[in-house]
UniProtKB/Swiss-Prot annotation:
Taxonomic classification: Bacteria, Pseudomonadati, Campylobacterota, Epsilonproteobacteria, Campylobacterales
Enzyme class at the top of the EC tree: ligase
Family: Belongs to the class-I aminoacyl-tRNA synthetase family. Glutamate--tRNA ligase type 1 subfamily.
PANTHER family with a match to the protein in the record: GLUTAMATE--TRNA LIGASE, GLUTAMATE--TRNA LIGASE, MITOCHONDRIAL-RELATED
EC id: 6.1.1.17
Pfam families: Anticodon_2 (PF19269), tRNA-synt_1c (PF00749)
Motif ('KMSKS' region): 235-239
NCBIfam families: gltX_bact
Motif residue range(s): 'HIGH' region: 6-16
Any one GO molecular function term: glutamate-tRNA ligase activity
This protein's name: Glutamate--tRNA ligase 1
């Protein structure tokens, strides 16, 4: 069972989307199932409506979870299992205040050593714990051995006990920390394979330790994806527009193209242009590069152009909000632009009322009136010759206003290539 577990705390990041796509593809390959879990336990950072945004984005990519879980609905289980860890002496109550811990961290910093919890509260007797009425957190006991796991991308990874440390699993308000809620939920929901960003590598031994402490014996597999870099080679910040899936949609990138590019990054693929369904046939999570990949919007634009060309007439009509009879005209304009709004603007200009260019006002009106009285011509050369004869215009004084009449612009693609696509609508275009 695979899962995608986003938090409703902001717009979806392309790194998160990449993980969702990879999990979904792998679930289709081995038919083991795919679930969505909304990790909403951080009430202060949650943003209302983001759960709906997550579902809508996944739907645009054709990602269909078999089950949707809300993490906060598992709170009673988190508390029950934290109590079990306390009873079994796998965890302990910690009464250290933030000020006390901060002082110890500062001392470690001054001494040039990594801070580790010193076990103060772990040594308290049951009687001392019961006698203390201070607020407390629950900490998982530091492991007594090296924690190791095999990563499908990075290989064998090991963490010494001090690197895992005695970490907090329940806060003073009796809500679970990320690692505890995540470990418990994966166990309860039958997750067996986790594909996520490499920023979670250090969380993995902690989550394994929690499940081990609870007596869970199910095998968990992992694949941690290298981070995505911006074009300058720096880690992509959530503040960068390109990192937001919502922003990419607003710019006019198709979900098909975004998915294609995210699968392509740091991967060896049999072709450069493909769909998620096609990727299911050959995708191999173990072949993802261990090195970070650069996210290049210009490359994404090229891929977007190809997906617009390949889209069905019905898909183009849906995306562009146009009659599907204009699909070939949309494809034609991919030679000038790769983004939906820009192409849409160019096509709409053809059918919009035209304004005569200031420098060609007279010629524009002459050509317009003459064109209204001409019949339909099969090819551009015959149309051009007939219009030249009717107006007596030639050269720049003919072609510039003619282009303005047909396209609404003074510059653009070859009219001889455009004409076959619009000849049936000339009466409407020049009206």
């Amino acid at each position: 069972m695979y899962r995608f577990a986003p938090s409703p705390t902001g717009d979806m990041h392309i790194g998160n989307l990449r993980a969702a796509i990879f999990n979904y593809i792998c679930s289709l390959q081995d038919k083991s199932g795919f679930i969505l879990r909304i990790e909403d336990t951080d009430k202060e950072r949650n943003i209302q409506g983001k759960e709906k945004d997550i579902l809508e984005i996944l739907s645009k990519f054709g990602i269909k979870p078999q089950q949707i879980y809300i993490q906060s609905e598992n709170l009673k289980f988190h508390r029950q299992l934290a109590s079990k860890l306390l009873i079994d002496k796998k965890a302990f109550a910690c009464f250290c205040t933030e000020e006390e811990l901060e002082a110890k961290k500062q001392k470690a910093k001054e001494e040039g050593v990594a801070y580790r919890y010193d076990g103060t509260c772990e040594r308290l007797s049951d009687a001392e714990v019961l006698a203390c009425d201070k607020p407390f957190v629950i900490r998982m006991k530091k492991p007594e051995r090296t924690m190791s796991f095999t990563d499908a991308i990075k290989g064998e990874l090991s963490f010494e006990p001090d690197a895992v440390d005695s970490f907090v699993i329940m806060r003073t308000d009796k809500t679970p920390t990320y690692n505890f809620a995540c470990a418990v939920d994966d166990m309860l929901e039958g997750v067996t394979f986790v594909i996520r960003g490499e920023d979670h590598v250090s969380n993995t031994p902690k989550q394994d330790l929690i499940r081990e402490g609870l007596g869970y014996t199910g095998k968990m597999n992992y694949a941690h994806l290298p981070i995505l870099l911006n074009i300058e080679g720096k880690k992509m910040s959530k503040r960068e527009n390109e990192s937001s899936v919502k922003w990419l949609f607003e710019q006019g990138f198709l979900p098909e193209a975004i998915a294609n590019y995210l699968i392509l990054l740091g991967n060896k693929t049999p072709s450069e242009i493909f769909t998620i369904d096609e990727a299911v046939k050959w995708f191999d999570i173990t072949k993802i590069s261990r090195s970070p990949a650069r996210f290049d919007v210009k490359k994404l634009e090229q891929i977007n152009r190809e997906h617009i060309k390949l889209a069905s007439d019905d898909r183009i009509a849906e995306v562009f909000g146009m009659d599907k009879n204009l699909a070939n005209l949309v494809r034609f304009y991919t030679q000038e632009s790769s983004l939906v709004p820009e192409i849409k603007e160019k096509v709409n200009k053809i059918f919009a009322p035209k304004v005569a260019p200031e420098e060609y006002k007279s010629e524009f009106e002459t050509i317009k009136n003459a064109a209204k009285n001409l019949g339909e011509f099969e090819n551009f050369d015959d149309f051009k010759k007939a219009l030249m004869t009717a107006t007596g215009l030639k050269g720049k004084n003919f072609f510039m206003p003619l282009r303005a009449l047909l396209t609404g612009d003074l510059h653009g693609p070859e009219l001889s290539e455009l004409y076959p696509l619009i000849k049936g609508d000339l009466a409407r275009i020049i009206a």
